[in-house]
Amino acid sequence: MKNLFYSMVLALCWQSNLSAQETFYVSSSGSDDNPGTKEQPWYSLNADNWTDGCTIIVLDEIYLDPVIDVSKEATIKEVTIKGGSPEAAIMGVNDDEFNDGEMNVSSFFDLKRVKLNLEDITLKNLHRDGGTGSGGMIYVDPYSELNLNNVVVRNGVVTTGVNCRGGAICSEGKLVVKNTIFEGCKAYQGGAVCLRESENPIYARFEDCIFRNNETGDGVAEDGSGAAGGALYIEGMEMDIAFDKCYFDSNVATNTARNATGGGIRLFLNEECNANVTFMNCTVANNKSVGASGFMHWARCEQGNVNLKFVNNVFYKNRTEGPQANLITSQKSAPTVGMSGSFVFVNNTSMMNNTGVDGLVQTDQNAINFSDFGGDFDLVFVNNIMLDCMIEPIDKGDGTMVDQLGWGWSIREKDARSKGEYIIKNNLIDGVGGAYDATWGAGFLYHFNNEDIATANNNKSVRGKSTDQKLKQVGINRKLTEPTEGIPYIEINDPEGYAIDNGVSSLIYKGEELIPQTDIRGVAKTGNSRDLGAFEYNGVVSSVNEFKVDSQVHVYLNHLTGILYFSEEVASVQMYTSFGMPCIPSAVNVTSVNIQNLEKGIYIVRIVDKNGKVYSEKILK
């Protein structure tokens, strides 16, 4: 059992600062009677003794139960909690207790009008027992801000009580997350994270994050759309949300009623919305729903402005057991004539996103499925590879052979079509489908079904070919490549394949260049044109793959000072993130460089010695 249960009430509000910033230490071997120094640490987080702007350093695993209540009446406006060792963790119960089903009284943190920073630490093993509030581990009110950097969030569960939203986090305020893993979390709405608008617009940023094995479950919520969003549930009118270099892996929307939607994300847009949601350089793989939409279920608003953007992403083997699309679904019973905005889909690679994989056979499934738009809504579809009907001929059971299952993209243009701009060019796809009424004019389907228009815009179909024929013609791998660092991707493997240099090199849309100049790994564009999809073949990569590794110069990092030392003077040194992006200015003729301001993570040091030899070292900061 837990060896500590304590009650802490922390009142935080926007009042004057009463004390200078301090640093306090916490250890399971300490005592709350101690002054909280490194030599004499506290035993608990000891919130009654915090000061505004203080930093709490957790040295090992500590328990937290019940919640640190952030009420409106206190003097503290900002607190930072960070790990001081690799073992540092805040937990509700230990691993054995969690696996045995032991539950907790409440959440970890309840933020009201405060800024909380969590760094270099693990939050784990909280199964909330009842309660009326949202957020399994953390609730963020509309006037608060939560920042996570290099955090592991594991086993946050909320499936009992009222408002079972966000197994890890429910945010109604500002949320900024970097280098963070959400794993094994579960809730009725938003297995890992719930983003809701109440009094202020939603603002959220996710960079270098992993959402893995999160799921929906049974439960209740006072309002909303039911069980949805294996990784995230998003609901509101106004929102600004962006995902960059994130990996959505094996998240599931499931519940007893089997109507859960959005294996990865449920995007619920309320009326008169103003929404901007962006995905760049992300990989979405093996997500599943039992209701509808393997990755994203998008509930459109009938009035408002919506801009969804997908650039440089990989979508692989996402699927649903329900009646709608395996990747993205947006269905309405009537055309959304009052909704304006855009759906931008550029340089993405989409493969095997249908139920005709892994032993599941259906003949009417699609990767993307949209119903009638009707309003001033733009559809931008450029430089994509969509090979989602990747099934050899099979017998349906009645002797009928089916050689293609579903479509890559299906859109209904029967009752109306979008009156916005269509930019549809340089795509390779194994089929588009849907309902089309020619009296509405040249819509999305017209750009593919009219042979002259398709040829003029370089939109090529490979429907009717076998799987091996498609892969060979495109010159692309069948499976994900999993690098040592960074997110998985699908690799172009043939310099003579159709994908090479067949993309648009530049596209200015509403004053913005849409064509990415680097691929999903950070590899720069080679030649005058981007390759199709999210991968650039044979590009110049600023990563360990470019470098020789027989190092004669030794590298030493002083973790206290943030100074990187070399055993001898080097001609030049450059540093890159694990995604191949430069992170400090190049230094010449040096014996050390200062990397104190770099965030914690894995970096590649590229060194040129005095003899001109080039090699690399990996370091962990």
PLM segments and residue spans:
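Bacterial Sec-dependent N-terminal signal peptides
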Residues: 1-22
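Extracellular beta-strand solenoids
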Residues: 26, 58, 69-70, 83, ...
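Surface beta-loop-beta hairpin patches that serve as ligand-binding interfaces in beta-rich domains
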Residues: 497-543
